[in-house]
């Protein structure tokens, strides 16, 4: 009876331990066979934070250009566009400022 329980536990523990080692190796390795950096996945939150801070800095700029909050034409995401590339004041006027 005890040997059956021991075999069942070993059959359960070994795959879990192997999976745990594989996961730890991914996190701790500096690069994989394709040259990708696994640690870069951890920095994705930083890119999101940078995007969010860019969007927050963009709000006062839009207010200074339009005199009001952005009212994007055609559903354009102004923060996505202007945080990935530089946007001119003319571009912001074109897509954000309400038509007179």
Swiss-Prot record:
Keyword annotations: Disulfide bond, Secreted, Signal
A GO-annotated cellular component: extracellular region
InterPro entries xref list: Insulin-like_regulatory, Insulin-like_sf, Insulin_CS, Nem_insulin-like_b-type
Cystine residue pairs: 54-83, 66-96, 70-97, 82-87
Entries under PROSITE patterns matching the protein: INSULIN
Major subcellular location class: secreted
GO biological process, one term: dauer larval development
Similarity annotation: Belongs to the insulin family.
Organism domain of life: Eukaryota
Protein name (database record): Putative insulin-like peptide beta-type 6
Keyword Signal tagged: yes
Pfam families assigned: Ins_beta
GO molecular function per UniProt: hormone activity
Signal peptide (residue range): 1-18
Subcellular location: Secreted
